[in-house]
Amino acid sequence: MNSINPDEFIEVTDESLSDFIKTHEKCVLLCWKEKCPYCRQFFPIVSSVSHELSNITFAHMNIDKNKKAAKNFNVRTVPTIIVFYQRSVKKGIIGMKSKFAIKNDIRLAFATTFF
């Protein structure tokens, strides 16, 4: 998928996902498929959110190539965003959403970890 800027998103795989989650206290994983037209539209939106939430590490994973991780996190629909905090899943965001909605959902996922 040509719209991915490697400087903005870390690519993770079945093998590297666990280390990624362990290494980054606050992280967001965007799950996608190459043939998904919505995923192509979604990347620029998530990229913009990643710039505004610069204290969070963003990564992407092609679930066609990484079926084990997709199964482990029950990813059946793309695009899907998984929000992690301290190695735990805090929220799943499924389907296309606006930039405002994504940013708000991510912020709320982290806000609930402190109550």
State where each predicted segment sits.
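Mobile acidic interaction elements
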Residues: 3, 30, 41-43, 65-68, ...
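N-terminal leader/targeting and pre-domain segments
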Residues: 1-27, 105-115
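Thiol-based oxidoreductase modules, predominantly thioredoxin-like and allied folds used
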Residues: 11-12, 31, 47-50, 54-68
